[in-house]
Each structure stands twice: as structure tokens, then as C-alpha cells.
Swiss-Prot record:
Transmembrane segments: none
PANTHER family in UniProt: CYSTEINE-RICH DPF MOTIF DOMAIN-CONTAINING PROTEIN 1, CYSTEINE-RICH PDF MOTIF DOMAIN-CONTAINING PROTEIN 1
UniProt record similarity statement: Belongs to the CDPF1 family.
Source lineage: Eukaryota, Metazoa, Ecdysozoa, Arthropoda, Hexapoda
Database matches in InterPro entries: CDPF1, CDPF1_dom
Disulphide bonds in the chain: none
Pfam families, per the entry: C6_DPF (PF10170)
Protein name as it appears in the record: Cysteine-rich DPF motif domain-containing protein 1
Organism: Drosophila melanogaster
Amino acid sequence: MDPDDDLVLENEAEEIERLQLPEELKKPIDPEEEDERVARIEFNCSGCEMHEMVHYFGRKPPFALGVIYPEDNYVMRDPFQPPPPRWQSKPEYYIAMGTKCSICSKTVCKDPGCSFYYTASFCLPCGKEELKNWPPEAQARIRKQMSVSQGRQT
């Protein structure tokens, strides 16, 4: 028996097609799509309507080594810093842009005129509603923050 006898195929064209890469894998990879430094997550503050593209949403940004937030945050790499070499696991500079309100889930930036943090992040309207449930120190802090933010708007 010839060793090549067991390689004879019933339908050679069908077998070749079965072994081909799927169409989506045949496309050339766009370097722009592969670049992890390109921001792809949209961030829109419901308070001040700031719009920005960010790199990460979650608690543990992969580019900010050792940083773990207590709640999900929209985080972007610092656009004014050069990227670190790929072979070094070096922490990068980053900017925490905002989060979602823990009550109404609206997206808010970290600006004092848009959000307040006390055990969790709140948009100012929800913060005003929750104010009565907080200790006096937190109440004084949010009242001061609201008066300062109202002073800036006028």
C-alpha cells in the first residue's frame, strides 16, 4: 500500500474550501483598528454636555498599573504624554473623566458643577435628593459645592 493512498479525497475542491480562512480573517488588518491608543468609547456628561472619546470604562484601567476605582469610571490616557515603549509595562498618565450616577445612571463628569462623591458618585440633582440621608459633614460639603458651582454659572 502506497502511503499517499490514504490522502485521496472524494471532493478535493470542497476540502480546500473547508481549510480556507473565513472571509473576515482574510481582510487586511487596519493599523488604526489595532491601535489600543485610539479612544473608542464615547463619553457625554449629562450635566455640562462635555463630549470626549475615552479609552476605557471600568474599575481597573490596564494602562494605569495598580489603580483600582471603587466604581466604574470613564478613563482616558493623557493625550499630552508620549506612549511608553510596548516592551515596558510602565504605568501611563491618565485622566478619570467621569462615571455614572449611582441612582439615575446618568453619565456625569468629575467637575464639581456636575457630580458629587460621597460613598458613591451622584449627579447634583440626585445628590440634592439624597442630601437629607447623609451626615452633617457631607451635607455641608455638597451645599458648599453647589453654591460654588451656581456662582460660576452666573
